[in-house]
Amino acid sequence: MKTIAFFNNKGGVGKTTFTFHLGYALEQIGKRVLFVDLDPQCNLTAHICSENIIEEAWGEQGNSLYKAIEPIVTGAGDVKTVTPYHVPGRGIWIFIGDLLLSDFEGELSNAWTQILAAQERGFRVTSSLLRMVKEFGESNQIDYILVDLGPNLGSLNRSVILSCDNFIIPMIPDLFSLRGTQNIGRVFG
């Protein structure tokens, strides 16, 4: 199982579109694909799921990614396992994004500080989402986990990039894309 994050510090370069098409192409050649929509704009979720599915996932008893980390955000416990949406008749699943994912940024910032102080909670918090995602992937024989990230270098994106096997930087041939790529190298280099 390979985990690949799609990230650029600049928006509008095709991260979500590339993630979506690569996932469906992999499924066409017989691979089992799990999408993870960690961009709070939730465009990957909107590409794959109907509005009814999204509304249900965001509801009180929903299964969005925010519902998974809500116990951490509220201080009630560790990550809660949620079930991704399975696209009918396809070898494709998606952990549904949520506009509220940005609420997790503050908790992750605190967790980075806890890691520097060698506190276990910091490690549990920063690994929580990808831990749950990878557990689902392993138990369902997923070949590829494709993670769509928003265009920022916040704590959530840093945690995910560091937890993935690879990350791809989609870009367009312009000065701002180049600058964004240089910024990524500065942060992760």
Kindly label every feature range from the protein language model.
Residues M1-G189:
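P-loop NTP-binding core
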